[in-house]
Design a protein with these regions (language model features):
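Selected alpha-helical membrane-embedding segments in polytopic membrane proteins
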Residues: 2-108
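Hydrophobic alpha-helical transmembrane segments and adjacent short intramembrane/lumenal linkers
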Residues: 77, 91-198
Length: 198
């Protein structure tokens, strides 16, 4: 077994090289709940920074005085308060669904897995933010297409990272179980989103 690399950036890079090994090392290190929460805050804050180009665009579209302050305040609140709560709820859902398919993890391992998957996926989020900053300089159709491709790539990349790490933390030997877990999670999230009034 390899030791956990020193520093967050080195640990992220090592996890990119071997996703299952990365979560195995992280679980072996036994991060504290405070450490997990710190990861959630870090991910939320970096996602907030990556979303600044979109926030500026949203504020301009409102065409109201102080729109920028309102948009930024709302996004910062979501990043630092709602995002961590969402991660905890999603980790619990992941554990419940994985258990139904024979997963052998715990609620703790589900939290470690999801929170670390979010941290490892941060380069994708930051790259998407960079692309979003370039979109206004492009023709509208090309900008929309490029922005959509970047968002899709970041989303699918995150799902791949999360699924690979879940396979390890839940001791799934067969890929079918992982696919089933994530199909159920996606369906449940979509149903919940439809039930929440706009």
């Amino acid at each position: 077994m390899h030791d956990e690399p020193n520093g967050l950036v080195a640990a992220i890079a090592a996890s990119w090289k071997d996703l299952r090994g990365g979560i195995r090392r992280r679980l072996a290190g036994g991060p504290s709940e405070a450490g997990l929460l710190a990861h959630a805050y870090l991910a939320g804050l970096l996602a907030f920074v990556a979303g600044l180009p979109q926030a500026m665009s949203d504020a301009r579209a409102l065409d109201q005085p102080d729109a920028m302050a309102g948009v930024l305040a709302g996004r910062l609140f979501a990043a630092l308060f709602l995002f961590p709560l969402l991660l905890y709820a999603l980790a619990a859902l992941q554990r419940l669904v994985a258990r139904a398919f024979g997963g052998r993890g715990t609620y703790y391992t589900a939290r470690v897995t999801l929170f670390w998957a979010v941290i490892v996926a941060l380069p994708l989020v930051l790259a998407e933010g960079l692309v979003s900053a370039l979109v206004p300089a492009l023709p509208p159709r090309a900008g929309a297409m490029l922005g959509g491709i970047a968002s899709l790539a970041a989303g699918l990349g995150f799902l791949w990272i999360w699924a690979s790490m879940t396979a390890e933390s839940e001791s799934f030997a067969r890929r079918g179980h992982v696919v089933a877990v994530f199909l159920v999670i996606v369906v449940l999230v979509l149903v919940l989103v439809r039930l929440i009034p706009s």
